[in-house]
């Protein structure tokens, strides 16, 4: 019998100008199945060898930081979220670790507490809040306190173009400027404000326009993801609302009318044959837990 299983959705962050603030949960998933107690933590997985199988694994290390008194268990981890592709793989692992601690340690954490803890680990709320809450989230971290608003976007379809090449988040962040001119900050913030307002009012054409006008990060990351302009042009011609980098890249994130997502994905797949084109949906449930029997420390 499976005593406890945890499912965490992938996420995309930024949506163009919503840098480190706007996130959307996606229909790719990390699954953690908790098995029996053990004398030490064991993580069963089929990922690359660089992913730890002991207490150094990000899921386990996060859980133990949240609840140091946890007894070791054997856990099995599976995932179809690509690693280091800008789809929130590390955020999903952090969220899974927090929930693992919450369940095994009987912490009774509220959703707000989970978001706060996850943001403290991640450094920004966009990916982790989306994975916890589902849907579309807009968040802000003010010192130690995080504020998050969740909205529904069920009319939207999602397409992700995933290259074979990995792109480490630290490398992608290293090309960003340390200082942002005031007039550029004003312009970039105004665009981000309109993006959020359009998301809330479901003005999808405006969302698409704003998500392609970022000044905060995409201009600096183009050298790392040179196909973005051509993908953006084709997606618009095929009927998409808008295209942006998914998180720090290298994956590309496209919003479409829900009923057109398959058609647009097929057209893009014929053009960009070197990339994996995934027709996705927005996950509206967020993290889910399935308990089969009582577990204690």
Curated annotation (Swiss-Prot):
Protein keywords: Amino-acid biosynthesis, ATP-binding, Cytoplasm, Kinase, Nucleotide-binding, Threonine biosynthesis, Transferase
Binding site for ATP: 82-92
Family of this protein: Belongs to the GHMP kinase family. Homoserine kinase subfamily.
Taxon lineage: Bacteria, Bacillati, Bacillota, Bacilli, Bacillales
GO annotation, cellular component aspect: cytoplasm
Physiological role: Catalyzes the ATP-dependent phosphorylation of L-homoserine to L-homoserine phosphate.
Gene: thrB
Reactions catalysed according to its record: L-homoserine + ATP = O-phospho-L-homoserine + ADP + H(+)
Name of protein: Homoserine kinase
Domain of life: Bacteria
